[in-house]
């Protein structure tokens, strides 16, 4: 079974942004009023209902309609003027707001920077080590102020500490009981605050 391929070459994406203006017979930077006026004139001339015998009239009408749709939309027109039909294709794929980012990242200097950083970091291996492992197997880890041995407390020392704390508590019995509180009791006394329990 043979494939139905048209004899026409598929249109290449332009980056100049002039072919839609040429379809309407205008210069780049034409005003919206000029675009509308020219569109009406060409649409009437190439409308398929007015040219039923001409099969190319329908294709020409579609091209004119497409050019008018793009050039009357300010966002699409700005993208087309700056990046051409390739910019419109990128806008369809990634959204209008990401067109500038796409072309910036696909520029020669961004690709070069990406390659240089990749080479300097060993295919980005050092970047992973900096984020995950404090770089170079921990050699760049921040130093702690006290050695780790001081954090170890033997069980005997811990028991001795508990005994001495209990003996101190027995020497000083609780003398004051908490007072009853209600809604009118002030939680913070006016005057100087004292955190000492000795009276």
From Swiss-Prot:
The protein's predominant localisation is membrane
Tell me yes or no: is rRNA processing among this UniProt entry's keywords: no
Q: Name one GO cellular component term.
A: membrane
SUPFAM superfamilies listed in its UniProt record: Chaperone J-domain
The superkingdom listed in its UniProt entry is Eukaryota
- InterPro entries, sorted: DnaJ_C_subfamily_member5, DnaJ_domain, J_dom_sf
What is the name of the protein in this document?
DnaJ homolog subfamily C member 5B
Q: Give the species this sequence originates from.
A: Rattus norvegicus (Rat)
Origin organism lineage: Eukaryota, Metazoa, Chordata, Craniata, Vertebrata
What gene is this protein translated from?
A: Dnajc5b
């Amino acid at each position: 079974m043979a494939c139905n391929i048209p004899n026409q070459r598929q249109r290449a994406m332009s980056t100049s942004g002039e072919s839609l203006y040429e379809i309407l017979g205008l210069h780049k930077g034409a005003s919206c009023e000029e675009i509308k006026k020219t569109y009406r004139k060409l649409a009437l001339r190439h409308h398929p209902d007015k040219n039923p015998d001409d099969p190319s009239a329908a294709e020409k009408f579609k091209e004119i309609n497409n050019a008018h749709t793009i050039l009357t939309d300010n966002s699409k027109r700005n993208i087309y003027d700056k990046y051409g039909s390739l910019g419109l294709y990128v806008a369809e794929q990634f959204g209008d707001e990401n067109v500038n980012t796409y072309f910036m990242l696909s520029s020669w200097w961004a690709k070069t920077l990406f390659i240089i950083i990749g080479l300097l970091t060993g295919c980005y291996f050092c970047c992973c080590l900096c984020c995950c492992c404090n770089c170079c197997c921990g050699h760049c880890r921040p130093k702690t102020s006290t050695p780790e041995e001081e954090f170890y407390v033997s069980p005997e020392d811990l028991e001795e500490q508990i005994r001495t704390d209990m003996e101190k508590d027995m020497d000083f019995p609780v003398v004051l009981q908490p007072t009853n509180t209600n809604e009118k009791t002030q939680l913070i006394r006016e005057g100087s605050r004292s955190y000492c329990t000795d009276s």
